[in-house]
UniProtKB/Swiss-Prot annotation:
Belongs to the TRAFAC class TrmE-Era-EngA-EngB-Septin-like GTPase superfamily. EngA (Der) GTPase family. Residues 3-167, 176-351 form the EngA-type G domain. This is GTPase Der. Signal peptide: none annotated. It comes from Caldicellulosiruptor saccharolyticus (strain ATCC 43494 / DSM 8903 / Tp8T 6331). The keyword NADP does not apply. GTPase that plays an essential role in the late steps of ribosome biogenesis. GTP 1 binds at residues 9-16, 56-60, 119-122.
Amino acid sequence: MKPTVAIVGRPNVGKSTLFNRLIGERRAIVDDTPGITRDRIVGETEWRGITFNVIDTGGIEPYSEDIILKQMRRQAQFAIDMSDVIIFMVDGKTGLTDADREVANMLRVSKKPIVLAVNKIDNISEQPIIYEFYELGLSDPIPMSAEHGSGVGDVLDAVVSYFDKVGINEIEEDSIKVAIIGKPNTGKSSLVNYILGEERVIVSDIPGTTRDAIDSYVEFEGIPLTLIDTAGLRRKSKIYDNIERYSMLRTISAIERSDICVILLDGTEPVSEQDAKIAGYAYEAGKGCIIAVNKWDAVEKDEKTADEYKKQIEEKLSFLKFAPVLFISAKTGFRVKKLLETVLYVYGNYTRRITTGQINDVLAEATTIYQPPSDKGKQLKIYYMTQVGEKPPKMAIFVNDKDLFHFSYQRYIENYLRKTFDFTGVPIVFLIREKGEKD
């Protein structure tokens, strides 16, 4: 595994700004409101030829009894426990505080190497302020500015100096990317936690307690998976501030970089228009889709309950007729293993390649049974079809006139392909081209 570095400190010292600078993208929510980064966000960076993981933790408020801030403290402790080196960030503008002292005591107990980074030192004249941080009795304080980049290289030099370069193994780059998506409070974080066997992300009954998209790595049946637990998507009418706007965009971005989307529904509630909207993002992005109905343990049911719920899904999510439906419980683990098996199965279909000969044998059979349509005496002619891409499967169909290839006939060809080849869980993209057009 790659080395892991946790960025730890009290709220609003600039941890997320440093994290974003290190990984080169706006992964963590950055705002002036203390406590905005509620959870652990994981990214990857490289320095001096060494690739390592970086964890951005929520700010530690040592004295707060607020339920979210208490959970953030626990999450920071998890990050400390799983890290190899800790970057302890303090605020050079504010100076040393009692909260800094308490965090330092917490870190000292871990016995992990600590790099003390004094942030918001934007010019040389401000550097004398760093000396008060020697009182913490940790490593030499390093002046830096996460916003402007000065001193960041010095911090990273100190970090990599602690790494044992022998035996560092990289995480598989070809892992299957799985986005767990759904409206708030459907149990997305609980599902990820059950799979990982640890309280990896904050779980609370308060909707929206997972604000950012969080990557976790796990192997299932020897196959590496990257699980992306996303902020629950809210209806746009409720997205009234910057934090919610950032998170919605991040969730859509998580869908874009995934291979498979697990669309989580709350089995204790009817399928809603909001569920359909969220599922629509995954469908429009061309991702493999699995519908998982969570909290099934909390549903009063008889032998008809599952079928009745499936009818709701068919009505509200009619565009996902190809997606398998599983009834699960993230709380008890009911059918979670089956869900992971289905992820591997759908991914196999998502990457499936079919020879041109096989495709055209099926095409000939389909057009014989139900001949192509005609309009004003002109008959649609389908010359051949070939697969030109995967993730999702893309089929180029060459015809004499694209205008004659009506949607209804395209749907017929798609259904015939699905009947012959296994494309469970994945959309099929058709590229209609007139003969003579380039691939």
